[in-house]
């Protein structure tokens, strides 16, 4: 899957999520970083994600209102789950039901690292 210009939700803002955001931004994706913890500091998160590439970044923290969640899920091309995020959350089940591909960090690195075969 080409990542450029895809809308990708990175679920979890820990070290893995920050690294995923950096890679996706470098590849030109439209990135939404989501973490259910509303006590996190948005500026601190931003300071850990280097700005590079042609991608864009939006950060969502805390519980998503149903309308916001539905709007977001309609527009996603891909979800990258951080390893610490439980895979049985209702929103994750909803993503599966909608057929949105859900990758881990290893799948993302594999796809991004693919080169052209000569």
Named regions from a protein language model:
Residues 105-118:
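Walker A (P-loop) phosphate-binding motif
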Residues 1-104, 108:
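N-terminal leader/targeting and accessory segments in enzymes
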């Amino acid at each position: 899957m080409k990542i450029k210009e895809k809308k990708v939700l990175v679920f979890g803002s820990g070290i893995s999520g920050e690294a995923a955001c950096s890679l996706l931004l470098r590849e030109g994706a439209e990135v939404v970083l989501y973490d259910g913890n509303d006590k996190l500091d948005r500026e601190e998160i931003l300071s850990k994600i280097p700005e590079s590439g042609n991608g864009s970044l939006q950060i969502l923290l805390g519980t998503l209102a149903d309308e916001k969640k539905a709007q977001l899920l309609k527009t996603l091309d891909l979800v990258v789950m951080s390893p610490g995020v439980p895979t049985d959350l209702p929103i994750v089940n909803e993503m599966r039901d909608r057929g949105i591909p859900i990758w881990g960090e290893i799948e993302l690195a594999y796809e991004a690292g693919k080169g052209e075969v000569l």
